[in-house]
Structures are given as structure tokens and as C-alpha cells.
């Protein structure tokens, strides 16, 4: 028995599957076939009016399911043919019972009794209203699709008041559970424009304004970090922005984009026009603090570099050669060579150190050269130097102790400084690290003057004070100017001498060599 059951069971399973597959993949019958014609003829307005008056309002799918149960072969028709048969019966109306079919939205239909005398007029008006609702629903379906793609937009479309009134008058007892669930479908759909949509039409480019604020901060830092390069053109282009500056405020404006000339756009444009002058004034006020900084930098330079009437004092020499061409002639520093002369002083303007006051030409020093062909010049234009130069006409006699000290300096190979401080009462010091008031003894105020012209002319190398002739010292004179010595060595600076003392010193130097 078990073997027979095993043999019979597979054919039974196969037959069940074949029936299921035939029912699933069954081809819908045509309306031209006898079964299709019989099913179509039984879909009448009277049958639909009876169904909707008893169970309405119903959706099309519920009406279709009820007709499939009542009419044989109706389920074998295609869904589109079923819908067309139902719609044609509703549009014709039930003239025998004076019932018209009204669409109340979203596929729900109801049956309404009318006056038999006005049946034709009511039927025409109802069909027109149904077509209107159909158009609204189709438009809503399209709007819902577009709303899914654009989540920022939303709105509200109101259905006719008549439809809402009909919904409220529906008897809940006659509505099946499926119809009650379908009545929860909203009739009003929100579809109005959001405030963000209007903001997208006209807007002020906030990115440009933010970048201008960043440029202002960067430009302020740029003035402090790179003012050395910018101050070169400050005398010619003061208060003007260069054309090549990528952070020029003159070319930056608020960008306003127009999409349509609606009243909202005009209102936004008026607001933008009121904002622009405030932004320009703000940018101008941010530039103003930089201009005193540039003018202060220009006034910080030495007066000898800014004034064309630069005075200098020279000492005559016997021979002229090309050995001193590498040195800067301070007599030629006029307004034409202003960029070259300003460059040395500008290099150290941000570093308050003694480099500027010792290496570069300064008004606190009197430059004395050791080459007979060179010139002893002064960059200062102070009246104290002129007074000292006027007093230097009288010869100065040294004591025996000072002569002995000078001779010992030559034997020991000590070198005298090149820069002699001549102004001991300066109103302002270039650096805070050096106190020029304490440099030098009180006697040097009267003795640190230019040497006698005869003694300088009679010397072999034009030395004001005795100096050794070693190669390292000569190379340092032809190269950079040496800084001043320490405070204790500056007490021995450049003692003027008469002709006999110079002769004795040079004799000792010749014996040493």
C-alpha cells in the first residue's frame, strides 16, 4: 500500500500545480465571445444603483469585486474592460429609478436620487462635475509625483465644497469596513509654496560677503606681515589699491541673481539696494586704520633719505683712485636714488635691534674712512655737528700721557672704531638697547671733532686716528662698516693729534711692518 501511495502521490501534486498555473496564467476572454457578451449585458445601471444605494459609496475596486461574485464570467474579463463597463453604466444613469451616479473623489462613487422630471438635466450636470473631479484628481496625482521628487515644495488644493458636504452626509452604517477604510483618504492636499521657494528666486550672495570679511582680516594681517614690500609704492600710490592685488575691495560686489520679476523679487531687490551702501561703508572703515600705519612707516625713515637737500662734510684727499668704488657715496643720495637708500633702512624697521643703528647709515654717527682716496662723510644734519665743525679750526694739543697711550695702542695693534658718536643729546633714540648719553667721557664732547686739515693731508693713508695696517683691517674697511666697540673701548676714540705726534706714530708703524 505504501508503494502504491508513493506512486500515486506525484501525479496528484502535478495535477494541482497545473490547475494553479492555468488559473494564474489564464488568458482574459474577449467581449466579442459569447461568454464575454453575456457578462457585459448583465452589467446594467439598475444593478449598480441597487448596489450603491444599499452599500454605497464604494470604490471602483469594491464594485468590481461584487460584480465578479454576482455575474458569471465577469472575472474572466480584463480589468480595463471591467472598469469600462462599470463607467459606461454609471454615465448613462438609472432612468427607471431616477438615480444618478456621482463621483465624490479618489475612486469613490455614490448613488443619488433625483426628480424624474429633471433627470436629464441632473444627469448632465453630474457627469460634468464627475469629469471635473476626475481632472482634479489626475492633476493631484501628477503633483504628488512631482512632490516626491521635490520635497521642499508643498501645497493645499481644496476640493469643491459640495463634495465635502456629501462626505459628511454619508451614513456610516451602510458603509462596509473596506469603504470606511477608504474614506480616510484625505481630500485636501497641501500644495502651497513654502517660504524657501521664494528665497530661491532672489538672493544675496552670502558667500561673497563672507569672503570679503575674510579678505579684510587677511588684508589687515598682510599689512603687518608684508608692509615692507607694500610701503615701497606707498609714496606714489597712497590710499589707492593696486590693480594686481587679488584682495582689492573695489572689484568685489554683492551678487544678486534674478529668476523672475515678481513683486517678491522687487521687494528683495529693494532690500539688497539698502544693504549695499552699508557694506561699502563697512569695507571703507576697515581700510582706514591701515593708512596711519603706512604714513607712520614713511615718517619713520631718516630725514637724510626723505629730503633731497642732504648735507655732508668731506675732508680733502691727495690722491684719487678706484679702490673705494664699492662704498656708497652719501653725497649722491638724493630723491632719485630714494628706493635704493630706503631699502637698507627698511630691512630692519620691524626689528628694534642695534643692527640698524650700527651697520646702516644713521644720523647718530660720523663716518670716518681710513683710505686716503675715500671721503669722511656725515649723514647728520643736526646743528650740533655744525657747531663742532666750526670749533675744529683751532689746533688741539695733547698731554704727554695721552701721547704715550696713543703710541702704546699702535704697538699693541689696537684698532679704532670707524663710527664716532657725535651727538650726545639726541631727542630720540633709534633703539632701546643702547644709551648714547652714557657713551664717551665728558672730554670727548670737545675733542671728538674732525682732525686738522694739515695733519690729514700730511698723513700717508688719511687716517684720522692711528690705525694698524694689517690686511684684515684693510679688508674690513673696503667691505662693510664695522659696528662701534664696547663702552670701555669708546673712551679711546679718535684723539686728534698734531703733526709731530702723527710723524712719531707713523714711524712706529713703519718699524713694525
From Swiss-Prot:
Listed GO MF terms: DNA-binding transcription activator activity, RNA polymerase II-specific; sequence-specific DNA binding; transcription cis-regulatory region binding
InterPro entries: Stb3 (IPR018818)
A Pfam family this chain is assigned to: Stb3
Protein name: Protein STB3
Quaternary structure (record): Interacts with SIN3.
Gene Ontology CC annotation, any one: nucleus
Record bears the keyword Cytoplasm: yes
Cellular localization per UniProt: Cytoplasm
Other facts noted in the record for this chain: Present with 639 molecules/cell in log phase SD medium.
Region called Disordered, residue ranges: 1-20, 134-159, 227-249, 282-354, 373-437, 450-513
UniProt biased composition (Basic and acidic residues): 134-143, 488-500
Gene of this entry: STB3
Gene Ontology biological process terms, A to Z: cellular response to glucose stimulus; positive regulation of transcription by RNA polymerase II
Sites of Phosphoserine modification: 254
Positions with biased composition (Polar residues): 296-306, 373-396, 409-418, 450-463, 470-479
Family assignment from sequence similarity: Belongs to the STB3 family.
Amino acid composition bias (Low complexity), ranges on this chain: 230-244, 307-324
Coiled-coil intervals, chain numbering: none
Source organism per UniProt: Saccharomyces cerevisiae (strain ATCC 204508 / S288c)
Keywords tagged on the record: Cytoplasm, Phosphoprotein
